[in-house]
Amino acid sequence: MRNFFTLFFAAIFSLGALILAIVACAGSTKNYSPINKIYCAELDLSQMKVSTVLPSLSSATLSSLGLPSYINIGLWSYCTVDSSHNIQSCSSPHGIQNFNLSSLVYDNINNNEALELMDSVASVVLPEKLKSKMTYYNNLVKCMFITILIGIVLTFVNLVFNVLRWIIHIRPLTWFGAFFSFFAFAALLVSIGSCLGTYSYIKYILKHNYSDYGISMSIGRNYQGLMWGAVVGALLNFILWCSVRSRPTVIYANAPIEEKPLI
């Protein structure tokens, strides 16, 4: 009976972690609520100093360039947001959404005359720390992307072992269940850790250069909430798997010894 309740609650926590991680992974892939409100980080371009970031367009304004006020960055794509915080559109998912602030600014200029005055994306001027360590940031973004997918797959596999463990009472199933539950938890933890660390540092750089560039960043709360919920669910699932007995407890009763009558 103890194993029944242990596996039951482990399945609930595992399923909850799986659903939360999948929803977080799908954030900003479509312009539908609530998917479009789930993002890793939000770029605030509403106060961007055009004369500094785009020197060749120093006389232009943010509105004349057609730039969005905000850009929500997801794992697969990003969404553009206007000054009223209404989401205008979301880009099509195309694999890992690398962080490249220059490209995000350049690709969202909706003014052909302005684009003609710019040579290329290299015309966008940004803090040196962002440009010099771009490869490092994107390696962390790749880590975040790959580990969340690994976490989702391992959590699903763990659910399969949970179902099998209800039917077949053998030790290898318990061992494999605990094995996959641990690495699912570890993968999800690494994913949210790399996300928080990467974008927090970029936020720090932009904050210390805000007076020159007027660009800031905030961390996506919905994404953080979903992912930390998935991590907690995966951790509880692992703890429960560690308390699953390999085999049901069997109590052997010895038959009473028949006493022989004294002669």
UniProtKB/Swiss-Prot annotation:
It is found in: Cell membrane. There is a cross-link at K260 (Glycyl lysine isopeptide (Lys-Gly) (interchain with G-Cter in ubiquitin)). It holds the Pfam family SUR7. It comes from the Eukaryota. It is a multi-pass membrane protein. InterPro entries: Claudin_CS, SUR7/Rim9-like_fungi, SUR7_domain. Glycans are attached at N100, N209. GO terms for cellular component: cell cortex of cell tip; cell periphery; cellular bud; cytoplasm; endoplasmic reticulum; plasma membrane. Its main location: membrane. N-glycosylated. GO terms for biological process: fungal-type cell wall organization. Residues 28-143, 194-223 are extracellular. Keywords: Cell membrane, Glycoprotein, Isopeptide bond, Membrane, Transmembrane, Transmembrane helix, Ubl conjugation. Signal peptide: none annotated. Residues 1-6, 165-172, 245-263 are cytoplasmic. Induction: By the HOG1 MAPK, cell wall perturbations, and nitrogen stress. Expression is controlled by the MSS11 pseudohyphal growth transcription factor. The chain crosses the membrane at residues 7-27, 144-164, 173-193, 224-244. Belongs to the SUR7 family. Contributes to the wild-type cellular response to nitrogen stress through signaling pathways that regulate the expression of genes involved in amino acid biosynthesis. Required for wild-type filamentous growth, cell growth, and cell-cell adhesion. Present with 1660 molecules/cell in log phase SD medium. This is Protein PUN1. It comes from Saccharomyces cerevisiae (strain ATCC 204508 / S288c). The gene is PUN1.
